[in-house]
Regions:
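Conserved ABC ATPase signature
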Residues: 95-99, 103
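Helix-to-loop junction immediately C-terminal to a conserved catalytic motif
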Residues: 2
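Short catalytic/signature loops enriched in Gly
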Residues: 182-209
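Conserved ABC ATPase "signature" region
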Residues: 18, 72-90, 199-200
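Conserved ABC transporter NBD signature motif
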Residues: 10-21, 33
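A short, proline-enriched helix->beta-strand linker immediately N-terminal to the Walker B motif
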Residues: 114-118
Length: 209
């Protein structure tokens, strides 16, 4: 969708603009869209450069898009982003190996927010985290969405997480969209067998036996 890898088929339309169309051989330059569209990766360990400080990781997008006029403005923005995701100013000078998985994912989120995007692809952003940390990160995603007016494409296989954060849910099976509905409607009245199998895997606090 973000064309980090070139699609092999189909059409991508964003905000009414065709970004990619295989049949029509359309593939627009994505640079103008990089600020508007960002991604949070699944693996908080592999997605951060171990040779860079946290401050430089978060600041990389700021530098590429020339978003700050001077070093002080850049520094202040980086610290503000770290604090927004639950980290602090001291973390800016540290390296990824000094952090837990949950903290690294917060760094990844701060990096995505650094260019003030409007749309973020969240690619299984909590699947590699402990359950207790998952809840914290999902709640943070919700808070950031409210504060910044963000739109998420939240990719996950755990419907208990998806239903908590999503307004609409689309279910993919064998590479095709088999069901799309409002979150409550899909959970309450699913049609496709694969959707039902995902729902049946959601833990129930007080199951009736």
């Amino acid at each position: 969708l973000l064309r980090l890898y070139e699609p092999t088929d189909g059409t991508i339309i964003y905000d009414g603009k065709v970004l990619f169309d295989k049949k029509e051989k359309i593939a627009v330059d994505m640079l103008p869209y990089r600020r508007r569209m960002q991604i949070v990766f699944q693996d908080p360990y592999a997605s951060l450069d171990p040779r860079m400080t946290i401050g430089d990781i978060v600041g990389e997008g700021i530098d590429i898009h020339h978003l700050c006029a001077n070093a002080k403005e850049r520094h202040d923005k980086i610290i503000s982003l770290l604090e927004r995701v639950g980290l602090n100013s001291e973390h800016a000078n540290r390296y990824p190996h000094e952090f837990s998985g949950g903290q690294r994912q917060r760094v990844g989120i701060a990096r995505a927010l650094a260019v003030d995007p409007e749309f973020i692809v969240c690619d299984e952003p909590v699947s590699a985290l402990d359950v207790s940390i998952q809840a914290q990160v999902v709640n943070m995603f919700e808070d950031l969405q409210q504060e910044m007016g963000l739109t998420y494409l939240f990719i996950a296989h755990d419907l208990s997480v998806v239903k908590h954060i999503s307004n609409r849910i689309g279910v993919m099976y064998l590479g095709k969209m088999v069901e799309l509905a409002d979150s409550f409607e899909l959970i309450a009245h699913s049609v496709h067998p694969y959707t039902r199998s995902l729902i049946s895997a959601i833990p129930v606090a007080d199951p009736v036996t």
